[in-house]
């Protein structure tokens, strides 16, 4: 089909417009052969009937794309494609009187903001626009085109439908991909985009389109950076996310030179994702036609890894009907001199045909719209409407009209580098038909498993493939079983908790059977009093813990398990049972254990459900430990007890420690006052009544309204908020502590110096100004204590110190010492006794420590067996060892290094190096014999024999040392390498202790001389091994690797065959590379270029004319 036939309405006349009948091409294109004859068809007469002004009209088509910023898009040669289309169109227009078409190549920036600007600029210059390519600019371009009356063909928009002035070239990419995914039932997909704006926007537009069709797009991620590392990171995000069947690659195809897709596929092969568990679908191939055929793809032929990874790729691309291809059409156009003869067709992207088709499709819509409008100028909307009905000759086949273009699914066979057609998409039904070749998945597998078909059914809500009614019933069953299980667990838990609370060692519910009262025959008021400890001031008790002592005459004291207890009654007298919330709250409070916090023992319940009926109704009380000295208020009121500052500070420090412990456990006392602080028989103060408000709230008992006298310790912010007063705050406890400190320091009631009634004091504290606070003179306490009190009285809660800060400040007053009157004398005696015991223990420990140091030092100088013999005073006889392995090493160029270094630097060098060696030999069965200068000597097989293992131990140690030396650097000359040479030899020797002063364990024999000779004839970074050692290593068969060095002249031995030890199988540590010795160079020194300039001057002064030497 040719342009002339579709301009008149789409009738086909192959004899009229053949490929040889085009008009001369525009400048830049080769000349076109002249048309020999003209034959008019009746539909063409429509153009001839148009007014002459219309026939001579010029229609400018803009081709917008990232031609300048994207080299792969530029390979589509949009200039040649658009000019070829215009040339053919103008040839038809010249023959049949149609309008003339001109094309303008417009660059589109690769960045999204620039793309929008390019669209806006292009719409003012053209009558029709092919583009944009960036999906982010598609919707704005359509709106601007409607306003400007310009027709659009946005072939790069993945989800665009024909609407307004927009007419797509092909079926939207989302529809084609959806059809493919539905055919294979792959619902869960992920999108990986290139980092450029164009592809990122395309990925988001495609994901939106797929989600609109009901598919669960699991992930949309970008490759950043756009290399192999970015590809690995993107694929790891795919692995870590929800299950995925297919990965859509929104980027240039690797078949066109896309490096991002190459990296992604190679990374997938490395990570094992190209094994058939995932399928990879390229996105950009939906916009052009890749043709199957026998031609090899060079990009696959040149890389076996990519060819293997590409086996997991299914390529969906436009289908050229009748077996044609873009490459064949390019070849025919070049043969007819419509394209330059020197154009390399292999370098032209198949996108050439898409650009050509877009221009032709737009021209067809213009022609049909003008005919329908009687020859007048038409709007973009009219052109778009007629494009849908136009049928034009595409570059490789018919295009447009009622028939949608089709797609073909291409695949490789994993071994070759060719593409085969497997399925063809039916454009009308949306189904694939087999093209004869089955899809080949990696490793011959079946590919990713299918998802439930409900994902592709618009009338079904998909829940993992299960029917909604079944899901709903299952959900109800699970919820019902969960509720039943929760109820059963709750019931069992509370039942078990109740059993534990009423019986056993941890019970907390106490009855009349558990507590013995002082006057069991009295009335109810004699059983449990109101719980105020104020009345204790009238008592005189010498020892309430003794049954034979004088007992107080009050019924709020009882005997529980042999100890006296105190009962604090709950308000009211109608408590039938203890609520579960009360039990839980009390269990948490009872867990508070501290020396300065009174211990709660249980909840007493008389009458009701608590046990045998008591006179009256049920009585509920908190049972706590009883303190013999009563409350702090009682103690302060007893004037016969003298309280000096030592005594007062001891009490206050106990109080601070107790409140601090409660605050650390998140407990605000809320009712802190001097009568809630009790003192035991040892004058240790303890905080009690804590958590009482929480227990009342759990038991749903309203507290009794506090009197003004009880509110003297309450912070001002709590006085203003009754609800907050019942609960208490941490800052409120600090304020109450400050009032108690005033009581203790002044030994008077709160605010006693103000001569005001409690009601007046509470009113002034609640409603300042002025501030109402106690007054303490500086002669009653240290100034630091008074300042701390004033900080605790601060009006603003946030200005008061925390209990940790209060504790630190108060400790600093007495320098951290705790004083107690009664314990003072006992403490002195105990301290003297304990000091004496500690002194003896310390001296004994020091003696033992020094002995261990001496033994450790001796064993470092001599073998343990020899050291023990010397300590016992027994003589150490020389011992003959049949077979040992010796190690010798020294530093190459040590004399040169010494000449370039200060003496202290030489010492530091040897100390650092030998410390490194000593750390290594600790991991091997070897014995360090000695070090002389830069020489290091180690032996294995003595003084403890180890069979033939000595050779392997020395060899392993030598490899470890050589590896460590490769990274060792001198502190004063880090740029100068430290090279060592190592010699190993196995054989017999004699070992013994020589001398009485500074005895040394020495080795004697020919083996020692030979090992030393092996070292001296070695090379830097080499392990020189004698034949005897190699034979033992071979017999051990532990994988040691040796190389033959050749015959070496050994001092006193003559020429012998020697070897290099180069490694061991499984030894993965790096070994430094031995330096290459130039002919005539010494193997014992340092090269001139390795010596720093500043050190070289010093060396010249020390050794003129010589720069290396041993």
UniProtKB/Swiss-Prot annotation:
Subunit architecture: Homodimer; requires homodimerization for guanylyl cyclase activity. Interacts (via C-terminus) with RD3 (via C-terminus); promotes the exit of GUCY2D from the endoplasmic reticulum and its trafficking to the photoreceptor outer segments. Interaction with RD3 negatively regulates GUCY2D guanylate cyclase activity.
Skewed-composition ranges (Basic and acidic residues): 1091-1103
Regulation: Activated by GUCA1A when free calcium ions concentration is low, and inhibited by GUCA1A when free calcium ions concentration is high. Negatively regulated by RD3; inhibits the basal and GUCA1A-stimulated guanylate cyclase activity.
Segments in the Extracellular topological domain: 57-467
PANTHER family given in the database record: GUANYLYL CYCLASE, RETINAL GUANYLYL CYCLASE 1
Family matches, as CDD domains: CHD, PBP1_sensory_GC_DEF-like, PK_GC-2D
Principal localisation: membrane
Protein name: Retinal guanylyl cyclase 1
Catalytic reaction annotation: GTP = 3',5'-cyclic GMP + diphosphate
Species, as recorded: Bos taurus
Region (Disordered): 1070-1110
PROSITE patterns (UniProt xref): GUANYLATE_CYCLASE_1 (PS00452), GUANYLATE_CYCLASE_2 (PS50125), PROTEIN_KINASE_DOM (PS50011)
Localisation: Photoreceptor outer segment membrane; Endoplasmic reticulum membrane
Residue ranges annotated as Cytoplasmic topological domain: 493-1110
Enzyme Commission numbers on file: 4.6.1.2
Any one GO cellular component localisation term in the record: rod photoreceptor outer segment
SUPFAM superfamilies, A to Z: Nucleotide cyclase, Periplasmic binding protein-like I, Protein kinase-like (PK-like)
All residue ranges annotated as the Guanylate cyclase domain in the record: 885-1015
Role of this protein: Catalyzes the synthesis of cyclic GMP (cGMP) in rods and cones of photoreceptors. Plays an essential role in phototransduction, by mediating cGMP replenishment. May also participate in the trafficking of membrane-asociated proteins to the photoreceptor outer segment membrane.
Keyword field: Cell projection, cGMP biosynthesis, Disulfide bond, Endoplasmic reticulum, Glycoprotein, GTP-binding, Lyase, Membrane, Nucleotide-binding, Sensory transduction, Signal, Transmembrane, Transmembrane helix, Vision
Record's keyword annotation contains Protein biosynthesis: no
List of glycosylated residues: 302
Signal sequence segment: 1-56
InterPro entries to which the protein is assigned, alphabetical: A/G_cyclase, A/G_cyclase_CS, ANF_lig-bd_rcpt, Cyclic_nucleotide_synthase, HNOB_dom_associated, Kinase-like_dom_sf, Nucleotide_cyclase, Peripla_BP_I
């Amino acid at each position: 089909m040719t342009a002339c036939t579709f301009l008149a309405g789409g009738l086909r006349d192959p004899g009229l417009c053949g490929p040889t009948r085009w008009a001369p091409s525009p400048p830049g294109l080769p000349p076109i052969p002249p048309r020999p004859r003209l034959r008019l068809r009746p539909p063409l007469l429509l153009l001839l009937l148009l007014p002459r002004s219309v026939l001579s009209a010029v229609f400018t088509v803009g081709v917008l794309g990232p031609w300048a910023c994207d080299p792969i898009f530029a390979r589509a040669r949009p200039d040649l494609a658009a000019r070829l289309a215009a040339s053919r169109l103008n040839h038809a227009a010249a023959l049949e009187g149609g309008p003339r078409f001109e094309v303008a190549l417009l660059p589109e920036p690769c960045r999204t903001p620039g793309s929008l600007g390019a669209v806006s600029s292009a719409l003012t210059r053209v009558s029709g626009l092919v583009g944009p390519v960036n999906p982010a600019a598609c919707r704005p371009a359509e709106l601007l085109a409607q306003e400007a009356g310009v027709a659009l063909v946005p072939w790069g928009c993945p989800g665009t439908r024909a609407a307004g002035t927009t007419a797509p070239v092909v079926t939207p990419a989302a529809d084609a991909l959806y059809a493919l995914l539905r055919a294979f039932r792959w619902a869960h997909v992920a999108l990986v985009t290139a980092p450029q704006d164009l592809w990122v926007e395309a990925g988001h537009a495609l994901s939106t389109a797929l989600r609109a069709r009901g598919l669960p797009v699991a992930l949309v991620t970008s490759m950043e950076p756009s290399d192999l590392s970015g590809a690995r990171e993107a694929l790891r995000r795919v692995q870590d996310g929800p299950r995925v069947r297919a990965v859509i690659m929104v980027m240039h195809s690797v078949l066109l030179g896309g490096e991002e897709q190459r990296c992604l596929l190679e990374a997938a092969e490395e990570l094992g994702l190209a094994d058939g568990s995932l399928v990879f679908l390229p996105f950009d191939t939906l916009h052009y036609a890749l043709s199957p055929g026998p031609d090899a793809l060079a990009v696959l032929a040149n890389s076996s890894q990519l060819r293997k990874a590409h086996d997991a790729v299914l390529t969906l691309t436009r289908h050229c009907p009748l077996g044609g291809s873009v490459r064949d059409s390019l070849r025919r156009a070049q043969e007819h001199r419509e394209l330059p003869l020197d154009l390399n067709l292999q370098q032209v992207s198949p996108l050439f045909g898409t650009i050509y088709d877009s221009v032709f499709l737009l021209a067809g819509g213009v022609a049909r719209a003008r005919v329908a409008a009687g020859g007048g100028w038409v709007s973009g909307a009219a052109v778009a409407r007629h494009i849908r009905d136009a049928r034009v000759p595409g570059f490789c086949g018919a295009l447009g009209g009622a028939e949608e273009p089709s797609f073909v699914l291409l695949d490789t066979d994993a071994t070759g580098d060719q593409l085969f057609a497997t399925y063809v998409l039916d454009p009308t039904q949306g189904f694939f038909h087999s093209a004869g070749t089955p899809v080949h998945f990696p490793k011959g597998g079946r590919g990713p498993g299918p998802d439930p078909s409900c994902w592709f059914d618009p009338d079904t809500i998909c829940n993992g493939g299960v029917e909604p009614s079944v899901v709903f019933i299952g959900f109800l069953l699970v919820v019902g079983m969960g509720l039943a299980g929760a109820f059963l667990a709750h019931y069992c838990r509370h039942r078990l908790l109740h059993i534990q609370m009423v019986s056993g060692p941890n019970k907390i519910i106490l009855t009349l059977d558990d507590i013995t009262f002082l006057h069991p025959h009295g009335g109810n008021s004699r059983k449990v009093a109101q719980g105020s400890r104020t009345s204790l001031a009238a008592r005189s008790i010498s020892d309430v813990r003794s049954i034979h002592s004088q007992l107080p005459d009050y019924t709020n004291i009882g005997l529980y398990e042999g100890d006296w207890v105190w009962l604090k009654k709950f308000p009211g007298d109608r408590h039938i049972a203890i609520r579960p919330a009360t039990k839980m709250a009390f269990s948490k409070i009872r867990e508070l254990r501290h020396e300065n916090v009174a211990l709660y023992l249980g909840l007493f319940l008389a009458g009701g459900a608590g046990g045998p009926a008591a006179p009256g109704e049920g009585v509920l009380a908190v049972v706590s430990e009883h303190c013999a000295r009563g409350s702090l208020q009682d103690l302060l009121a007893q004037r016969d007890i003298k309280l000096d500052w030592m005594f007062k500070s001891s009490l206050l420090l106990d109080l601070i420690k107790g409140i601090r412990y409660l605050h650390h456990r998140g407990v605000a006392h809320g009712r802190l006052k001097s009568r809630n602080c009790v003192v035991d028989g040892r004058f240790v103060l303890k905080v009690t009544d804590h958590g009482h408000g929480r227990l009342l709230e759990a038991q749903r008992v309203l507290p009794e309204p506090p009197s003004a006298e009880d509110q003297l310790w309450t912070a001002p912010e709590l006085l203003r908020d009754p609800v907050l007063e019942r609960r208490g705050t941490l800052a409120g406890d600090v304020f109450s502590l400050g009032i108690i400190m005033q009581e203790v320091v002044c030994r008077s009631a709160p605010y006693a110096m103000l001569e005001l009634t409690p009601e007046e004091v509470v009113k002034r504290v609640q409603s300042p100004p002025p501030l109402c606070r106690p007054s303490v003179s500086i002669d009653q306490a240290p100034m630091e204590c008074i300042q701390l009190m004033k900080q605790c009285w601060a009006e603003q809660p946030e200005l008061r110190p925390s209990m940790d800060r209060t504790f630190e400040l108060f400790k600093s007053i007495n320098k951290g010492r705790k004083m107690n009157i009664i314990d003072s004398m006992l403490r002195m005696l105990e301290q003297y006794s304990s000091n004496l015991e500690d002194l003896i223990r310390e001296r004994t420990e020091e003696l033992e420590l020094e002995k261990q140091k001496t033994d450790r030092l001796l064993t470092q100088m001599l073998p343990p067996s020899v050291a023990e013999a010397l300590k016992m005073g027994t003589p150490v006889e020389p011992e003959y060892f049949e077979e040992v392995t010796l190690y010798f090493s020294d530093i190459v160029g040590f004399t040169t290094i010494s000449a370039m270094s200060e003496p202290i630097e030489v010492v530091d060098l040897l100390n650092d190096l030998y410390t490194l060696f000593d750390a290594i030999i600790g991991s091997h069965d070897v014995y360090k014999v000695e070090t002389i200068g830069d020489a290091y000597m180690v032996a294995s097989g003595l003084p403890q024999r180890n069979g033939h293992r000595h050779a392997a131990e020395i060899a392993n140690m030598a490899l470890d040392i050589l590896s460590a030396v490769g990274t060792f650097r001198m502190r004063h000359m880090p740029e100068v390498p430290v090279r060592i040479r190592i010699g190993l030899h196995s054989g017999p020797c004699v070992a013994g202790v020589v001398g009485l002063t500074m005895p040394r364990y020495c080795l004697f024999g020919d083996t020692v001389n030979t090992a030393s000779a092996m070292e001296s004839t070695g090379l830097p970074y080499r392990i020189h091994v004698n034949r005897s050692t190699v034979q033992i290593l071979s017999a051990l068969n532990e994988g040691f690797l040796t190389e033959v060095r050749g015959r070496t002249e050994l001092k006193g031995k003559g020429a012998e065959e020697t070897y290099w030890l180069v490694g061991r199988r499984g030894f993965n540590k790096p070994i430094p590379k031995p330096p290459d010795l130039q002919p005539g160079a010494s193997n014992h020194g340092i090269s001139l270029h390795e010596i720093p300039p500043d050190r070289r001057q010093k060396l010249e002064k020390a050794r003129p004319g010589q720069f290396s030497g041993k």
